[in-house]
A protein has these predicted regions:
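Catalytic core of non-heme Fe(II) oxygenases with the double-stranded beta-helix
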Residues: 248-251, 255-258, 280-350, 389-395
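Non-heme Fe(II)/2-oxoglutarate
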Residues: 332, 358, 363-427
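Histidine-centered metal-chelating micro-motifs
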Residues: 94-95, 295-296, 362-366
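Feature captures hydrophobic
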Residues: 2-165
């Protein structure tokens, strides 16, 4: 595929510079930019907060407290502590929140927010409404996202594609649905080579290596369920990064995607992660519940990237599946809405070895546990081209790698148990 149809919907949602600066203090923000945007977007945001039934929440920034609450005339923010739930941030974390460099979830699991689990839950629940006020991205309402085919009729969500065939239809489908399945992209020999390198990396991993997440089965088998920086351990994968077939995936859409890091830290170079999901896993993050790859932050600076899954085993009920919420990349969706159920269709992808799954970084997706056979997949991706003045602004790669590795730390998950703990049959 060489360049998408220019008439296809763009997935470039960037509205903020990577090096965006924020307020000098919490007082300056709440009395200035917040008040200004509340005057513009306040009615919609108040309705969003009401639908989500958000509790009062105090945000303390370096000792200066302000409280968010639903008042009689919309969302109110009051100086001082006026809530039973309080989260604490330093000024740098608060600036990252306002700029969306990090979301509330990203700050909580990154150990940059202090609060008990209930306060952290409330903090994360308020986050979509903060975006509704600050950026005008209203929280999703039923019917907001129609799924329309290229012919104007309902979009057929069961479509499968091959590179070089039906290019316009593939581009339309990916932009509309937020995912696509590409059949028979890589050969058995290539997959065998990656599988062998993956096995070596699994055997070499250790709990404290800073490059792996660990899980355990009900039989007590502890294993590395996710190998970070797998591209460093797989020469075959590094060769594929320059292969025309791989590069063609980034050309499906007209937005200029190029190999990069779609996972949340936004490194300047291409990265990969090797995942294995063993039967009977009961501890750890072998599988993740519904989430977006931008859930931890950066949506308005980086989205939408493309997350690429190279299937080393089939994706099916036996090996474990991949579900995607069609159209979810086009909406600001609160976690509570996902838990209650959306009117958007959840599509269970079924793939063979050598197929490639693609989903946008803003698309809600989840993996499901294997029933009888281990699942193995390598995830890598594409990012949008940098804009003038853009640069990696999240700190050194070493620090970012440390932050990513810490997600697998079970003590971090305890900060927000309901958000991150695997759930039977759907994590």
């Amino acid at each position: 595929m060489t360049g998408g149809d220019p008439a296809v919907r763009s997935v470039d949602t960037r509205a903020r510079a990577v090096n965006a600066t924020g307020p000098d203090s919490a007082d300056a923000f709440w009395t200035g930019p917040w008040a200004d945007t509340l005057a513009i977007h306040g009615d919609r945001a108040a309705a969003d907060a009401e639908r989500l039934d958000l509790p009062p929440l105090t945000i303390d920034v370096d000792g200066t407290a302000w409280t968010l609450l639903r008042g009689g005339h919309g969302i109110e923010v009051r100086a001082g502590v006026h809530a039973a739930l309080t989260v604490g941030l330093d000024t740098a974390a608060f600036v990252d929140l306002v700029c969306e460099r990090r979301t509330a979830l990203g700050l909580v699991i990154g150990a940059r927010a202090t609060g008990d689990p209930a306060a952290n839950e409330a903090f994360c629940a308020w986050d979509p409404v903060l975006r509704s006020v600050i950026d005008g991205r209203g929280v999703y309402r039923p019917g907001d996202v129609p799924l329309v085919g290229a012919d104007g009729g309902p979009l057929d969500l069961g479509q499968r594609f091959r590179l070089g065939e039906g290019e316009a239809d593939a581009a339309h489908f990916l932009a509309e649905a937020g995912f696509i399945l590409l059949e028979q992209v890589f050969s058995a020999a290539e997959l065998d080579a990656i599988d062998a390198e993956f096995a070596v990396a699994v055997n070499a991993a250790s709990v404290d290596d800073g490059e792996s997440w660990w899980a355990a089965t009900r039989d007590g088998d502890r294993y590395p369920c996710r190998l970070l920086n797998f591209e460093r351990k797989s020469a075959t994968l590094r060769e594929l990064f320059t292969d025309p077939r791989f590069l063609a995936i980034g050309e499906i859409l007209p937005d200029g995607h190029r190999p990069g890091d779609p996972f949340g830290e936004h490194f300047s170079g291409v990265t990969a992660e090797g995942l294995t999901k063993r039967v009977g896993s009961v501890e750890g993050l072998a599988c993740l519940p519904w989430h977006k790859d931008c859930d931890r932050g950066g949506h308005s600076m980086y989205c939408s990237g493309l997350t690429i899954g190279i299937c080393l085993t089939p994706v099916d009920p036996a090996h474990g599946g991949l579900d995607v919420m069609a159209g979810s990349h086009r909406a600001n969706i609160a976690r509570a809405q996902t838990d209650r159920g959306l009117d958007l269709p959840a599509v269970g992808l079924r793939a063979d070895r050598g197929d490639v799954t693609v989903h946008l970084s803003c698309a809600l997706h989840r993996s499901t546990h294997p029933a009888t056979d281990e699942r193995r997949v390598v995830y890598t991706g594409f990012t949008l081209p940098p804009r003038a003045g853009d640069a990696v602004a999240n700190g050194s790669r070493t620090n970012l790698e440390r932050e990513r590795a810490a997600i697998g730390d079970p003590t971090r998950r305890g900060r927000l148990a309901s958000e991150l703990e695997p759930r039977p049959g759907r994590a």
